[in-house]
UniProtKB/Swiss-Prot annotation:
It comes from Drosophila melanogaster (Fruit fly). The keyword Transcription does not apply. One of its GO terms (cellular component) is Golgi apparatus. PANTHER family: N-ACETYLGALACTOSAMINYLTRANSFERASE, N-ACETYLGALACTOSAMINYLTRANSFERASE 4-RELATED. Residues 280-342 are annotated as: Catalytic subdomain B. This is Putative inactive polypeptide N-acetylgalactosaminyltransferase 12. Residues 30-563 are lumenal. Belongs to the glycosyltransferase 2 family. GalNAc-T subfamily. Keywords: Disulfide bond, Glycoprotein, Golgi apparatus, Lectin, Membrane, Signal-anchor, Transmembrane, Transmembrane helix. GO terms for molecular function: carbohydrate binding. Residues 1-6 are cytoplasmic. Residues 433-549 form the Ricin B-type lectin domain.
Amino acid sequence: MEVFASVLNCCFKYIVLPVWIFIVLLLLHRDLSSWDGLMGPLSHPGLGENGSASYLSVPSWEIDEYTQGWRYYLYNSWLAERIPLRRSLPDLRDHRCQKLEYDEDSDEMKPASIIMIFRNEQLVVLLRTLHSLVERTPKYLYIELILVNDHSDTDFWNDKLSLIFFDNYVHRYIHPKARILHLPEQVGLIKARNLAASEAKAENLVFVDAQVEFTNGWLSPLLDTIAEQSYTLATPILDNLDEQTLAYQRSIERRGMYDWSLTRREVPLSRARRSHLPWPYEVAAVRTSVFAIPAVWFQDISNFDNNLRGFGAAELELSFKVWCTGGRIVQVPCSRVGHLQPKDEDYLKRYGDLHKMGEQKSRNLKRIIEVWTGDLKSAIYKYQPHLLNISEGDLNEPRKLYKQNECQSFKEFINDITPGLNHVAALNRTDYASGHVKTLEFPKKCLTINAKSQNLFLERCSTNNTLQNWTLTYVKDLRVAGNICAEVRPNLRLGYSFCHSLGGRQSWHYDSVSNQLMSNTKCLEFTDELNIFLAICDAANGKQRWILDNINLSVMQSANILV
């Protein structure tokens, strides 16, 4: 049976798919209306219509394909191939949004260049994004579409015939004058955006991710918002595309901000702010999955620090640059876009070497702190002490640009951009402990992340290993490398995921008397260096006793975190 399944997979990969591509190339001259939108060789008509959840049983001979797709794409890629490229979506806007009329012919509301950066995307998801874009965006609201392939290197994107197919398909069915740039080497999100922006012709730029689906009326509110006031960056509400069923799910309106560790937080809107919905509201932290911005302004602020490399840098620096140049970030509830955001744990698997990711993010944060935060950097280093030992590199150019723009102090950012958020713990709380997490039995062994197994293990302690520098934070999670948290798996083994600050399996307490680390009702225990798990608490069990380097007992006691 396994041999048969393997033969079927090979036939599809090397015979069916190439033949399908060849047929598509032959049919590219036909009208889209007569073909009903290239369903794809595996799609099921009607599946996922109106953004509904899709359910299909996976045949036994396709289990391997299903599993491998999950491991790489971080969502149900097997199902994604079976949902038509063109599907309807629900209109989840407030009823008042649907009645609004925008002066789209005014001189102030300029059309945009729409820019998409992608790398190693699943073809059907990318094409579904593009179809939803062109079919739900009036042509007079944008003058060009720029697609930048940041040196994709998976099987499909490495094949010349596949690139020909993609380019021809886009020009025939998406936009006849779309500009497609296939970069010869990977440059990263920030540089790819800057490159595309330098090529753009419109007075406004709209950047979009490759894993989104657009709803009716998404673009007009964004362009209207940036037309009303100069130096405005506008973002939509990002709804959720479920990674298992691809269902379109409504998100509630929230406000982005940064805490003292420069970690992004989503906090509820105040009652006063909610009473003014669905009108736009200002936020402190931008989400760059979809955003609109005046082109000249973006060019002015795009080259602050060319040495930042992705992974948490783009959104953080852009938020600061907007504030520095007298701008504002505005969330627009009348604009809604579905976003396929995989679970954090799966997201980690895709990028592999977590140690390098942690080093990269730490260096990014160090550069941003040294350039932007001024007198308050000591407060931030208190939450990120491991950054003190990291080299930030040459900062002459970003500091020069910072001074040229006459940026105000970081205190002004806190006071001006985050008013009314003082009730949020992130702004004024102190963490409970930081440093190494060691076993009392083997005090030279420290809790460390294993990027390959997705588990945690014990390794010889090192002051230079950023993946051993833990913080028991004010929100009672145990985090490392800025935004990675220890998490209890359903099988009670200890793993990790990106922090969500919502408790649950990421909630931790420390008992300084018994030296036990507790998550909910169970205690952290080890049997050897590779086996760390949660078990019934036993104060007499030496393998449940842990040491945290720097414990703030007074804060623990005042917060009643001590058990």
